Curated annotation (Swiss-Prot):
It is found in: Plastid, Chloroplast. One of its GO terms (cellular component) is chloroplast. GO terms for biological process: translation. Belongs to the universal ribosomal protein uL22 family. This is Large ribosomal subunit protein uL22c. PROSITE patterns: RIBOSOMAL_L22 (PS00464). It comes from Guizotia abyssinica (Niger). GO terms for molecular function: rRNA binding; structural constituent of ribosome. Signal peptide: none annotated. This protein binds specifically to 23S rRNA. Part of the 50S ribosomal subunit. It holds the Pfam family Ribosomal_L22. Its main location: plastid.
Length: 154
């Protein structure tokens, strides 16, 4: 079994004042893409969620070049997730002395980038397991109408 170098870096943004549903709409577009392609997509999309995600992707790439010394052309977004954060509750004053509750949602965004040039070691145990696996399995065919099935039983 070969030990693999750590090839992943991450950037985490917490308490971003935005709905998690709106941030997921942008995150789904960039998951699995390269770093340069992601920056182009985020600059051209017209959503408010693009700017904090752009900053996180840029920060993750800076972490990769600082910590591992990797080139930005080799980076790929391997995992991107949006989690629901705390909800800030405020009051909106209305007519006749009434007030309504306003909920301001927040979200936590995690961007994990992987350097594909450092992925040169392969785990030998996983290769032997997949080769030993049986290739074809025979499935028995049961026809429920020919043997009566459960229709004739009470």
């Amino acid at each position: 079994m070969l030990n693999k170098r750590t090839t992943e870096v991450y950037a985490l943004g917490q308490h971003i004042s935005m709905s998690a549903h709106k941030a997921r709409r942008v995150i789904d577009q960039i998951r699995g893409r390269s770093y340069e392609e992601t920056l182009i997509i985020l600059e051209l999309m017209p959503y408010r969620a693009c700017y904090p995600i752009f900053k996180l992707v840029y920060s993750a790439a800076a972490n990769a070049s600082s910590n591992m010394g990797s080139n930005e052309a080799n980076l790929v977004i391997s995992k991107a997730e949006v989690n629901k954060g705390t909800i800030m509750k405020r009051l909106k004053h209305r007519a006749r002395g009434r007030s309504f509750a306003i909920q301001k949602p927040t979200c936590h965004i995690t961007i994990v980038m992987k350097d594909i040039s450092l992925d040169e070691y392969i785990d030998t145990d996983s290769i032997t397991w997949s080769q030993n696996k049986k290739k074809d399995t025979t499935m028995p065919y049961y026809d429920m109408y020919s043997n009566g099935g459960t229709w004739d039983k009470k």
